[in-house]
Amino acid sequence: MRTLMHKITFAGTLGAMLLGGGLARAADALPPVQKMGSVEYLSGGIGVDESKAIEKASPHWPLTLEFAAKDRQRADFMADVKVRVRDAHGHDALDATSNGPFLLAKLPPGSYGIDATAAGKTLHEHVTVKQHQPARAVFVWAGDAST
């Protein structure tokens, strides 16, 4: 009986270690968190592992932005997008360049105007960030804005 209990304990410990390792790998795949003033953000999503890690982390961030270019035949993710987020008073909350098709930001609750610029074309969106309710905005450039 004692041997059985040791096996069960070992199996439980091993399972917890494997699960923890999986979570650590997902966190390792995230790009580094950066900061502008009091706003933390991360951007990226180049590569399958990083893209999946960002999608998994997205619900835990108040704001998710996604960038793509679409023509008649296909849609491509965008990188090197200049992002400017302004609060309801017109003050810059975030001014950054996204390193990939996703940008996650920890903004306080409120209304924000967002300008996203790629290949000289600027798109505008408005979002409302609410407490415990993540907001998402998707920017899609028509044609081949990725060049």
Model-identified regions with their sequence ranges:
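Primarily secretory-pathway and cell-envelope proteins
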Residues: 25-81, 118-147
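Bacterial N-terminal signal peptides
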Residues: 11-20
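A short tyrosine-centered beta-strand micro-motif
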Residues: 110-116
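Bacterial N-terminal signal peptides that target proteins for export
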Residues: 2-12
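Short, surface-exposed beta-strand/beta-hairpin micro-motifs centered on an aromatic residue
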Residues: 100-106
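Short, acidic Ser/Thr/Gly-rich low-complexity loop/linker segments typical of extracellular
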Residues: 91-99
